[in-house]
C-alpha cells in the first residue's frame, strides 16, 4: 500500500500540488484504501482493488479525482452519518472519523454500486493564484 500512496503523492506534486496538498490527498487515499482492505472482504478473501488518480490543470487550478473500485461487500461511505466531534469522548461512537476527514479534505464524494463493484470517487480543486499579464 505504501508504494501506491507514494505514487499518488509524487504524481500530485509533479502535477502542481504543493507538498501539504499532496500530503492531505495521500491521507485521504490512505483512509479510503485502509477501509477497503479492512471491510470489503469480511471472509478474509485475498482480493485486489483498483486505485485511479487523475489530475487536470486549468485556469481554476488543479482538479484532482481519486477513484477506488473493489468487488467487496456493498458499502456506501457517503451514507454514513458524520460523527459528533463536539461530543464528550466517552459518549462518542467508535469509528467514522476517517470518513469525516475524507469529507473535510475533499470537495465532493460520489459512490455507486455497479456490476457487483463499489465505485467511490472523491474530487478536490486545488485553486491556483491568477497570474497577471
List each language-model region with its residue ranges.
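Conserved beta-strand-loop-beta-strand hairpin that lines the nucleotide-binding pocket
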Residues: 37-133
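Conserved short strand/loop->alpha-helix "switch" segment adjacent to the catalytic nucleotide/phosphoryl-transfer site
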Residues: 6-30, 34, 91-93
Amino acid at each position: 500500500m505504501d508504494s501506491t500512496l507514494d505514487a499518488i503523492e509524487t504524481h500530485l506534486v509533479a502535477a502542481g500540488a504543493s507538498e501539504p496538498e499532496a500530503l492531505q490527498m495521500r491521507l485521504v487515499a490512505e483512509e479510503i484504501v485502509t477501509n477497503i482492505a479492512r471491510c470489503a472482504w469480511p471472509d478474509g478473501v485475498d482480493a485486489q482493488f483498483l486505485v485511479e488518480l487523475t489530475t487536470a490543470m486549468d485556469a481554476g487550478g488543479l482538479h484532482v479525482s481519486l477513484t477506488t473500485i473493489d468487488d467487496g461487500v456493498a458499502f456506501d461511505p457517503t451514507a454514513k452519518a458524520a460523527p459528533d466531534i463536539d461530543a464528550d469522548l466517552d459518549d462518542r461512537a467508535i469509528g467514522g472519523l476517517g470518513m469525516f476527514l475524507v469529507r473535510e479534505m475533499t470537495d465532493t464524494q460520489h459512490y455507486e454500486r455497479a456490476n457487483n463493484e463499489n465505485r467511490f470517487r472523491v474530487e478536490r480543486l486545488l485553486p491556483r493564484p491568477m497570474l497577471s499579464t
